[in-house]
Amino acid sequence: NETDTNPITYFAGDPEEWFCFPCKVGKLLCFVYFNAKYTASALSMANLFELATKEEANQKPDLILLFGNPDGKNATEFYYDETENIWLGCISDDPRIEYFGYLKKMCLTLHNLAAMQQGWLPIHGAFVNITLNDGRKKGIMLMGDSGAGKSESIEALKSVGKDVIKDIEVVFDDMGTIHIEDGIPYGQGTEIGAFIRLDDLDPG
């Protein structure tokens, strides 16, 4: 839910028990602040989001997330700081949030809010660039709800098209954006990794 109060103002944690995970969500710099007890979940983000460089970590972020704020609100909220031009998210401390998905989804929510602010279209789907044996290149985008089979369709495409497809480059596999430059649509991903159900893959 959107809030009209900056979450930083009601941060209730002990700074000595909190850490920052600076990462890139797409092209945006995100600082994820988390309580030490959620270290396992927070560090798992390294599988999906690129770790910011030392130089980037010293810059002003585009996004800020407070994960596990002991504010007693039992809420998941986001806020836009117009003065600083930063999107902020806050997830209240609760045993239920010990789930990596809460971290990932809030990071993506903040990214999507910032993307829409630029006029970009967030897409829940998959986008691939295909190079055929004759040199032609095509882009294919698949959209659908969770579990619809987007990732599995890409794997199936690799199998059934192996005689005509030279290479498949995955641009994004879960969440990305589409934007227009000089009248041409471009796709951009948010993550460097992806989750896939092993039982949906062919052996080998």
Task: Briefly describe each language-model feature range.
Residues F100, L121, S146-K150, V171:
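Active-site-proximal structural scaffolding
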Residues L65, M116, G144-S146, D173:
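Generic detector of intrinsically disordered, low-complexity, polar/charged segments
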Residues S146-G147, S153, D174-H179, Y186:
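FAD-binding core of FAD-dependent oxidoreductases
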Residues V164-E181:
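Short beta-strand-centered segment that lines the nucleotide-binding/catalytic pocket of NTP-utilizing
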